């Protein structure tokens, strides 16, 4: 079976481990770039899905949506600075996700939503705990669409001090391995249900 991972740098960090863990069970592919915010997803999703047949699509958007930017969207801005704003406000995020879900459902693949991992204090260009609101919005979309959730946020939180870099949304190599264990097990579970 063919599995597609869609996500940002967090998914880039766990892809190789997931591929290794699912060796012999699934061929694990990942989009060729950082998925960025949902707005970027909407621009590129058709190209990422291509004409291939996917059995499972494990997807996340969030950390780039809840990022603060100013004039230059490629740079993070201080959330408290005048003129800084969320890259994708919450209501738009929810709407964009619903649209992305429709486009992915059209492939006939089994979809798995991976929720957004924790934003710690002192993380550049983001507000601590903002992932909670975004995950709640995403949960509404996924519940309505009947899509299961890989609760990577709770998994990360269980060992956050050990696995996440200080004041940073990213993880250590062993931290990515820890995330990969959860991702691989959720994908394996869903492959057996197909």
State what each model feature region is.
Residues 30-37:
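Short beta->alpha junction loops
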Residues 20-27, 39-193:
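Alpha-helical cap/lid subdomain in secreted, periplasmic
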Residues 1-16, 37, 64-66:
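Catalytic nucleophile-elbow at a beta strand-turn-alpha helix junction centered on a G-D-S/GDSL motif
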């Amino acid at each position: 079976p063919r599995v597609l991972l869609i996500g940002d740098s967090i998914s880039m960090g766990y892809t190789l481990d997931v591929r290794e863990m699912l060796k012999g069970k699934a061929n694990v592919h990942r989009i060729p770039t950082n998925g960025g915010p949902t707005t970027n997803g909407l621009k590129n999703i058709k190209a990422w899905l291509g004409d291939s047949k996917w059995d499972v699509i494990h997807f996340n958007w969030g950390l780039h949506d809840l990022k603060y930017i100013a004039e230059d969207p490629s740079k993070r801005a201080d959330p408290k600075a005048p003129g800084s704003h969320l890259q994708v406000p919450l209501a738009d995020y929810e709407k964009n996700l619903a649209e992305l879900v429709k486009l992915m459902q059209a492939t006939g693949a089994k979809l798995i939503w991976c929720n957004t991992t924790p934003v710690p204090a002192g993380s550049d260009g983001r507000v601590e705990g903002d992932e909670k609101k975004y995950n709640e919005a995403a949960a509404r979309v996924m519940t309505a669409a009947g899509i299961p959730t890989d609760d990577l946020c709770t998994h990360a939180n269980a060992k956050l001090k050990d696995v996440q870099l200080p004041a940073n949304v990213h993880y250590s190599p062993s931290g990515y391995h820890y995330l990969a264990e959860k991702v691989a097990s959720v994908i394996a579970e869903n492959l057996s249900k197909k």
